[in-house]
Amino acid sequence: MGKLQDWSITTCLFLFFLHASQTHCTSQSHVRNRLYRSKRGIGSSIDTSHLNAIRRLSVSLSLQNISGVNQQEQKERDLIENLPGQPSVNFKQYGGYVTVNESAGRSLYYYFVEATNTKNSSPLVLWLNGGPGCSSLYGAFQELGPFRVHSDNKTLYTNPYSWNNVANMLFLESPAGTGFSYTNTTTDMENPGDMKTAADNYVFLVKWLERFPEYKGRDFYIAGESYAGHYVQWRHGCGDFGDSYNVRTEDDESNGCYGMASVV
């Protein structure tokens, strides 16, 4: 009885959060348009400092305290056997946290679904929704993920057009404060910015690949929509990331990010 009650609570929280995410996302295009108008103003210039920050990030920062974590055990804990009301599928899915800043207590939540049938050869795609602050779970369950929500708001059905038909999909809740991602430091919420978001995304990827090392060496793409068009540009700082993790690129086919895309 207690387990059934826990699932009921989980289902309610999931559906409430999905509805809240959808409501929030309806305004992201307005935020994006205001930003573009301000950038086109007289004397204005686009801030690219976050790209330089990514280049300065070291792997030693990315791997802080990672040696004390058994990544294989953490991966097993992240395994999602079944979502509430989901149909039977032939791929695995995972959800969990990756700490990107130990001292601040800042952790990002991810939802990962393997490619159907071809997980061992398909590329890895990182998906980011816009906002800023729009949950990538909205993208996962309303746009390009493997499931959609039935009209009864209680069960799921498979999405025949899911991107995981051709790729391993990694949905990231970023920046901290978005969706299930959180921080224990108040100033993180008071002083957000693209530079901090890009740096956290970089650290997340380095640590995530320690948890899922089988995806090192894969073709790697970054994709997103709306304001995420600003985030995906941190691919220019992925050279150091690729050097350490042998992720294929479009530049030299051995390091960094293989491609990027932004959907308006």
Swiss-Prot record:
GO terms of molecular function: serine-type carboxypeptidase activity
Protein's name in the database: Putative serine carboxypeptidase-like 53
UniProt xrefs under Pfam families: Peptidase_S10
Gene from which the chain derives: SCPL53
KW Glycosyltransferase (keyword) present: no
Similarity field: Belongs to the peptidase S10 family.
Signal peptide: 1-23
GO biological process: proteolysis
Disulfide bonds: none
InterPro entries cross-referenced by the UniProt entry: AB_hydrolase_fold (IPR029058), Peptidase_S10 (IPR001563), Ser_caboxypep_ser_AS (IPR018202)
Glycosylated residues (UniProt): N65, N101, N153, N184
GO CC terms, sorted: extracellular region
Subcellular location(s) of the protein: Secreted
Keywords: Glycoprotein, Secreted, Signal
Principal subcellular localization: secreted
